[in-house]
Amino acid sequence: MSQREARGARAMPGLGQSPAKATPRLLAGTERKRSRLSRRGQDLWEESSWSNQRWSRTAPNPRGARARSLARGRSEASPENAARERSRVRTLRQAFLALQATLPAVPPDTKLSKLDVLVLATSYIAHLTRTLGQEMPGPSWPPFLRGLRYLHPLKKWPMRSRLYAGGLGCSGLDSTTASNSGQRTKEAEAGPHVSGEPDALLSTRQLSPAPSDK
């Protein structure tokens, strides 16, 4: 073995040995590198997780704070809101009961909804307006009020469909009332002529000479 070969063997110790002895050393070196890399990655992950936890503790969530403030406001103002709502409902109910009491021919124990009371009250007001002759429905009136006829509560209740149909002017009540009113006007116009016939007969009898004078 020459001096050059000996120097190369010293520089590269694995070359002069058998492959069975060189492989365990290589495997041990790779395992050391892997363990070092895994330790570094674990340290980095622990540091990042610790920083995230610390940030989450120091910086509160704005949504959570807002929700808590809203919940506190609701819990504090809920009794006042509930009392205000109860008083509003009570006042509204008393007003509707008073309006129902003013409607004619409605028994006090009759159960009517708010919409029923409003329809009956509107139709009754329209009937009174037409009866007094202060203001007749014209083209400026809404179509709902133009077609209104007075609806008797006992005749139309509890037939809700006919109640609202009559209030809207879609039922046969409007045609019957119109025909009855037209017939009454015709009779009123023909009344003086019929009543004037007996007076004319009496006047002719008085003007004719009596048979005893001849």
Swiss-Prot record:
Residues 73-87 have a biased composition (Basic and acidic residues). The keyword Nucleus applies. GO terms for molecular function: DNA-binding transcription factor activity, RNA polymerase II-specific; protein dimerization activity; RNA polymerase II transcription regulatory region sequence-specific DNA binding. The keyword Disulfide bond does not apply. It is found in: Nucleus. PROSITE patterns: BHLH. It holds the Pfam family HLH. Residues 1-87, 175-214 are annotated as: Disordered. Its main location: nucleus. Keywords: Developmental protein, Differentiation, Myogenesis, Nucleus. InterPro entries: bHLH_dom, E-box_TF_Regulators, HLH_DNA-bd_sf. Residues 48-59, 203-214 have a biased composition (Polar residues). Gene3D superfamilies: Helix-loop-helix DNA-binding domain. It comes from the Eukaryota. Forms inactive heterodimeric complexes with TCF3. This is Transcription factor 23. It comes from Bos taurus (Bovine). The gene is TCF23.
